[in-house]
Regions:
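Aromatic/hydrophobic pocket-lining residues that form π-stacking "cages" and hydrophobic walls in ligand
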Residues: 87, 154, 200
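Residue-level recognition of beta-strand->loop/alpha-helix junctions
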Residues: 102-104, 171, 213-216
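Generic structural signal for well-ordered alpha-helices
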Residues: 151-156, 197
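N-terminal secretory targeting modules
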Residues: 1-63, 249, 253-256
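Catalytic His-Asp segment of secreted/periplasmic serine-dependent ester chemistry enzymes
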Residues: 175-258
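Conserved SGNH/GDSL esterase-like catalytic core that processes O-acyl groups on lipids
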Residues: 61-63, 69-149
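Alpha/beta-hydrolase-fold catalytic nucleophile elbow
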Residues: 132, 170-171
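A short helix->loop->beta-strand "cap" motif at the edges of active sites that frequently abuts
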Residues: 162-166
Length: 258
């Protein structure tokens, strides 16, 4: 019933308002966001060792897929980006070096990860795949049925192309700290995000893939911490990405150890 009410609210006013509002936001973000280069073919690459300096065990090959959060938007340096922060925490948790490759693309939706990023896993010999996706599905009003189909296809393709690699799906965050979205747009976006987030969670469970609920495990930590958001008011800053990494890295470590 809650999902139906959310969909009715979104369908009545949310879709047209969101499409107009987000269009203006995206134009502004393009001119003001701080981010690492993301032109076609740009890849984030970093090899990190445990902070203790003592590495015991073989290198972990981690690939991070997804949207702007996986592409470095909001992070002035590579070391502060979400993929590298996750890799560093994973190295610390496992006591092993981590070789991280980030293939995220700003603006990507679930269907883009499925069709354009997942195929790049072939022959990479990866140990772990982290997918952080869904925010652009919210702002572009992907329907719940399409979200379920595309998420399922994405996870199955990841399983086929990544072999025995551990796979973790990071879910849609809360938009409560995204000051770039004025009210009531922010409320409408957050309402619809909750619908698609449940689709992600349920589909991941059906496919036997670990789901990390960023909205529950990380987003609440942004409250009262303005430095957690980047200057564009939409993407996390390094501090905020640290909150995300605190939730994502333990899940990867657990999957690698299972």
């Amino acid at each position: 019933m809650a999902d139906q009410q959310a969909l009715l609210a979104w369908g009545a006013v949310g879709v047209p308002l969101a499409l107009l509002g987000v269009l203006g936001v995206e134009v502004w973000l393009a001119a003001n966001a701080e981010y690492l280069p993301d032109e076609p073919g740009y890849v984030l690459e970093s090899r990190v060792a445990p902070a203790s300096g003592a590495a015991d065990g073989p290198e972990v090959r981690l690939v991070v897929l997804g949207d702007s959060t996986a592409a470095g938007v909001g992070a002035p340096t590579l070391a502060e980006s979400l993929p590298v922060q996750v890799a560093q925490r994973l190295a610390d948790d496992l006591g092993r070096p981590v070789d991280m490759t980030g293939l995220g693309v700003s603006g990507a939706r679930t269907i883009d990860v499925r069709d354009e990023q997942i195929p790049m896993l072939v022959d990479r010999g990866v140990d772990a795949v982290l997918i952080v996706i869904g925010s652009n599905d919210v702002t572009h009003a992907t329907s719940p049925s399409a979200m379920a189909e595309q998420t399922r296809g994405m996870l199955r393709a990841a399983r086929r192309n990544a072999g025995e690699a551990a796979i973790v799906l990071g879910g849609i965050p809360l938009f409560g700290s995204a000051d770039a979205l004025a009210q009531p747009l922010r409320l409408l976006v957050d309402t619809y995000a909750s619908v698609l987030r449940r689709v992600q969670r349920d589909t991941a469970a059906e496919e036997g893939v670990c789901f990390v609920n960023i909205a529950v495990e990380a987003s609440p930590r942004f409250a009262g911490v303005p430095e957690a958001m980047s200057s564009d008011g939409f993407h996390p800053a390094p501090v905020g990405y640290g909150f995300w990494a605190d939730a994502l890295a333990p899940a990867l470590a657990a999957e690698l150890g299972s």
